[in-house]
Amino acid sequence: MSESVPPTHTFTQIDDADLTGLNTLGLPARAQRLARPTTLDALSQVLAERNPAEPLFVIGEGSNLVICSDLPGLTLSLAIDGMSLVKQDNTHVWVAAGAGVHWDDLVAWTVEQGWQGLENLSLIPGTVGAAPFQNIGAYGVELSQLLEQVTVMDVVTAQVTHFAGNECEFAYRDSRFKSRDRGRYIITGIELRLNKMPQCNVSYGPLKARFGHLSQADILPAAVREHVIAVRQSKLPAPDVLANAGSFFKNPVVTKERGDALKRRFADLVAYTQPDGVKLAAGWLIEQAGWKGKRLGPVGMHSEQALVLVNHGNATSADVIALAEAVCADVQEKFGVALEQEPVLLP
């Protein structure tokens, strides 16, 4: 279903905008023009006044980006706000949120209402709009399991379209919006279906250790959220304290045969059986390759979580890319496994 949004509302635009504070790696960059539309009407107007031939970038809070140079053309940072209960039945609630909502604010609000589903995704940085783009996930839960629909705007026609969750082509840290339709749509909001009665997923690592002895009825979303936050804060640096883009590499998935072969060579290999093979813990691979806590110039892999690439100060995108390539090369040499970076490179 599509609908046109009339371009009637104004928007604020900044020329030659500094993006250093708008990417959590703290990389120096500027945008030729930066706009922050707060409504669908404002976004429609931004697109109507844009030259279709000029580059267009959407950056959210910049928590999953490596900005490699100044961005030409138009850069958007959506500020479409709002969280609401759409409908409910005896067992579920449907909630909506605008693309500009801080992701953890949405998680906190739903958990406060007693609704279950998002608690494992607590404290993931970024905005709601970025969540379906890369199908965020943590501790055994992915957004795709909870998402009912994504609302988008076509960058050319300004038409608003709603994609059902099963139309989004979700995969591990991927979606149609990140792959084949990248650049065609701007995500403006999402709708989720959550449980009224707790059915918390505590099958993953530290959650199983904390809650595994309890019955499902005794595991509350608020308690799971609290523990997830504690675990993340103990392992992951806050971007405002130590600049980073979260997990820098995806956990590679290999065939069962390859996983078994690695397990025979490395008895303490951290791996998880998947329908399509075996998922390896990239952080473990990086640590075993000698990169945990190791620096290369102003950047390095974090001392508590080897999966996180950090900027110790004054780093450039070239520094980041050089470190990522060095880590990948060493993991490939030691394990024969190729790592794939998670953040998007711009431009």
Curated annotation (Swiss-Prot):
Obligatory cofactor(s): FAD
GO biological process terms held by the UniProt record: cell division; cell wall organization; peptidoglycan biosynthetic process; regulation of cell shape
MF GO annotations: FAD binding; UDP-N-acetylmuramate dehydrogenase activity
Cell location: Cytoplasm
Catalytic residues in the record: 173, 247 (proton donor), 342
Gene3D superfamilies reported for this sequence: 3.30.465.10, UDP-N-acetylenolpyruvoylglucosamine reductase, C-terminal domain (3.90.78.10), Uridine Diphospho-n-acetylenolpyruvylglucosamine Reductase, domain 2 (3.30.43.10)
EC number: 1.3.1.98
InterPro entries in the record: FAD-bd_PCMH (IPR016166), FAD-bd_PCMH-like_sf (IPR036318), FAD-bd_PCMH_sub1 (IPR016167), FAD-bd_PCMH_sub2 (IPR016169), MurB (IPR003170), MurB_C (IPR011601), MurB_C_sf (IPR036635), Oxid_FAD_bind_N (IPR006094)
Keywords noted in UniProt: Cell cycle, Cell division, Cell shape, Cell wall biogenesis/degradation, Cytoplasm, FAD, Flavoprotein, NADP, Oxidoreductase, Peptidoglycan synthesis
Disulfide bridge partners, by residue number: none
EC class: oxidoreductase
Catalytic activity of the protein: UDP-N-acetyl-alpha-D-muramate + NADP(+) = UDP-N-acetyl-3-O-(1-carboxyvinyl)-alpha-D-glucosamine + NADPH + H(+)
ATP-binding in keyword set: no
Name of the protein in its database record: UDP-N-acetylenolpyruvoylglucosamine reductase
Organism of origin: Alcanivorax borkumensis (strain ATCC 700651 / DSM 11573 / NCIMB 13689 / SK2)
Gene it is expressed from: murB
